[in-house]
Amino acid sequence: MLRFQRTVPRVAIRRLANVYSEGAVLHGYKVRRAQEIPEMRMAAVELEHEMTGARHLHLEREDQNNVFSVGFRTPPPDATGVPHILEHTTLCGSQKYPVRDPFFKMLNRSLANFMNAMTAHDHTFYPFATTNQKDFANLRDLYLDATLRPLLRHADFLQEGWRLEHRDVGDASSELVFKGVVYNEMKGQVSNADYYFWIRFQEAIYPALHNSGGDPEHITDLSYEDLVAFHQNHYHPSNAKTFTYGNFPLRDTLRKLDDEFRGFGRRAIPQMHEKPLQLREAVSVEEPCQIDPMLPADKQCRTSMTWICGNPNDVYETFLLKILGSLLFDGHSSAFYKKLVEETGLAYELSVNTGVESQTAANFLTVGVQGCTDVGQVHKVIMETFTALLAQPFEKHRVEAILHQLELSKKDQKSDFGLQLLYGILPGWVNNTDPFDLLSLNSALQRFRADWDREGDGLFQRLLNKYVIGKPSFTFTMVGSSDFNQVKDQNEQSKLKAKVSSLTESDKEVIYKRGLHLQELQNSEQDLSKLPTLTTADIPHSSGHYFVSRDGPITTRQTDTNGITYIRMKRPLKGAIPYDAYPYIPLYSDGLMNIGTLLEDASAIEEQIRLHTGGISVSIGVHPNVETRLSELYLEISACALNSKTQYVFDIINKIMNETALSVRSEKMKVLIRAAASSFTSYAAENGHDLARLHTGAHFSQTQAIMEQTAGIEQVRHMNNLMSIIEKEAEFNTVLQNLEAMHRKIFVADGLEVMITTDNRQTSDVVKDQALKFIAGVQQSAGAESWLPEKYSRRALEKPYPALLQFPFQVHYTAQSTQGVSYTHPDGAHLQVLASLLTFKHLHREVREKGGAYGGGATYNATDGIFNFFSYRDPQPVRSLNIFRNAGKYVLNEARWTADDLNEAKLSIFQRVDAPISPSSEGLLQFRHNISDEQRDRRRQQLLKSTLDDVRRVADIYLVQPSPSQHMSAVVGPELPREVWSSQWPVIKV
């Protein structure tokens, strides 16, 4: 059997080194150096543009998912968010593409599987990834013109940044309020308690690096003139770092870059001056934060201690620090997790800033906690633990486990490998760290192994003595304040009042007319003919088929896995879990992997997993049947290991599943519950629209109703209930005993299947034998009662009012759901096209541009048959719900969609359908979701053949004709003013 491996032949790498030899000049670029990186099957070339000094890094690899990025060093001068707002406004039109918002227009004129722009703490970059060479050229052209020659119109600054505008734009008597996309985005961002702690910590320890995203209290100080000046000072080729990855010709990109850059000339770039605090003595900072409703009143503190540990430009020492950080902080066996969380119960979880982080000109080593009471005792235990570490050797197997994970990370081929390399390189590269050093993992590992063999623990003890023991620290603490959000609101209103009071009547007239003008611009039709586009002719008519072989309970696939074997298991649960036990599913899954077994604690199990495998996970998945939409629950286990270590996977899974201690290790279970509770509010602040969608979708779908119990607002309420009984021994033990009983019915051989993905027949045969022996050793049947999916009823539909899911945020999230059809029904494809058209041709304008929400749109869940609307970080949630409610009528009565619009909608869908997948995921859709290649092909043709008449027909059937009670809505966020919402809305408080 002929097997084709996607590798970079050494001959090709040598050819690359010959073409791009040091000193060679190509299209205005001089080659600085070229280097083979065999462990990644890749070659790297660094070049410098002779005229401007712009640097380019190319990573040549036989990967069809090519990446391009242009980035600039953009240290913020203040907290107004000027780098962030500039990132938005550069993408609102350029000299070559003078249409409004070409970036969002290109989202559905392309087959790119990734397009974005990102503002980091001291740099801004614009990456995309695509497998289509024509698409690559189109997007590269758009990104370069957008960043170097943006129009930066005042109207775009007002829309994307901030503005004063009447609440009702058409009513000059309505109150003036702050509006703006970034303004509302950051109000939502600071509602995330983890982010707020992290950003305030960063600002305190590194005051020279301001909040690049922008503090809502300061965003309204930014002027349009400041924005334009910041672009002129920073967006210049001499300050640029460009990046390419993949197998497209480098020459084409160099030629294009030279054409774009040569008119700029060379400019002196200001040297980096941003330095962190100079800790000549200990520094302590304390600030208030919002109350976390998931935590007890006496656990509303977060605190951390930080030491500054050299410069990231010393790549090897930074590498050592990160290994040390993993030993100190990662996992159950780490010293600080044990001392601060597990053994003493001083806190619920380690803090978000715990670890080793490289930030511009400094490495920080930080250890902190959240959910604590006695801050002084936490700091005392931290210092005692560091001192004890000097006398206690690190276990050799823990170090070997870390090295094993690093080795696996080089071999594990992710579909976004190029993007991940970019994310790892760019922060150091913009701050003068050698990118080749950042790529040379092998040399760092070899040097470390030699040093570790020679010095052992002395290697880490030297670092602790150099930077931590007896050295000044920076302590940062936040304490929950009951009036925190009220104070924030008052500050906003005071600032608004001050700005409004300074306005003359003439100013107010200008603001009113400006608001009308902006609305007129937002409503205007754009001439998109200047924008490049692909067509449906560029979409392959058949999708990739991944051949799998099935023999009894074993499914196998051979592909290029680079020496790794991936193992998946599934078992239909049928009657194993009664529906009233569904809220316990997350605790069950978490407990299996994190409390240990009867004979070994969690630390021992975790170290075995890290030392011998690439990871093992156990979960309960719920998937709708693609024909009937009835829910099907599965036990799902995923793992991977080097081809030579697959037996460890089965041995460890057998140990976890057959020797579980769910009802024995009660104290460890309490630790897990507290940690989950301490992180849920931050999760909700990032995913409020998902919580809303689960709540509304639960009215129409068994799958969504179950997920509402396991991951939605019902899980929040369940978690609160667990927290209330956690110290009531009898009640809590009953919970654990029920989990144990549930487990005995879940893990049986009846229906158990295994999928093996590896790169050669010999390994496949070996692992197949291991899997069959594993199945034979599992209990055959649990005698579970029959469970019928239809027994899990959907929510009653008698209350068509939106529900308010109340959280202490500064902005809202919304969702509206309605019933669709099954995956195999032909209308499903038309509904998916409708969702894309509504998003890009209606909702983006109405919800984001006019309404000021950070995001909004429509989605169609193809497997579950639910049509969803959503908005994200939305200052006007009720307005958005009204837009959603009338969307069907808009399609029938107002939309003037064209064949080009339909073409673009299909392109946006196939970006996701045809996005590259990793070798480990090939064939997984068929194994896990029971969707065959034939069903995928049939749906593909339905999507390609969908017409505008089809779209209008399904809009009428599924959006217009259903009664109001068949459209369910929800809002996540703070209480709404009574004048904008109905008292009939049910309110669900966390």
UniProtKB/Swiss-Prot annotation:
UniProt cofactor note: Binds 1 zinc ion per subunit.
GO cellular component, as recorded: mitochondrial intermembrane space; mitochondrial matrix
Enzyme nomenclature, EC number: 3.4.24.-
Residues of the transit peptide: 1-56
Record-listed Zn(2+) binding positions: 84, 88, 185
Cofactors (names): Zn(2+)
Catalytic machinery residues: 87 (proton acceptor), 160
SUPFAM superfamilies, sorted: LuxS/MPP-like metallohydrolase (SSF63411)
Enzyme class: hydrolase
Protein's UniProt keywords contain Glycosyltransferase: no
GO biological process: mitochondrial protein processing; protein processing; proteolysis involved in protein catabolic process
Compartments reported by the entry: Mitochondrion intermembrane space; Mitochondrion matrix
GO molecular function: ATP-dependent peptidase activity; metalloendopeptidase activity; zinc ion binding
InterPro entries documented for this protein: Metalloenz_LuxS/M16 (IPR011249), Pept_M16_N (IPR011765), Peptidase_M16_C (IPR007863), Peptidase_M16C_assoc (IPR013578), PreP_C (IPR055130)
Cited Gene3D superfamilies: Metalloenzyme, LuxS/M16 peptidase-like
A matching Pfam family: PreP_C
Keywords: Hydrolase, Metal-binding, Metalloprotease, Mitochondrion, Protease, Transit peptide, Zinc
Subunit relationships: Monomer and homodimer; homodimerization is induced by binding of the substrate.
Function of the protein: Degrades mitochondrial transit peptides after their cleavage in the intermembrane space or in the matrix, and presequence peptides; clearance of these peptides is required to keep the presequence processing machinery running. Preferentially cleaves the N-terminal side of paired basic amino acid residues. Also degrades other unstructured peptides. May function as an ATP-dependent peptidase as opposed to a metalloendopeptidase.
Record-given protein name: Presequence protease, mitochondrial
Organism: Eremothecium gossypii (strain ATCC 10895 / CBS 109.51 / FGSC 9923 / NRRL Y-1056) (Yeast)
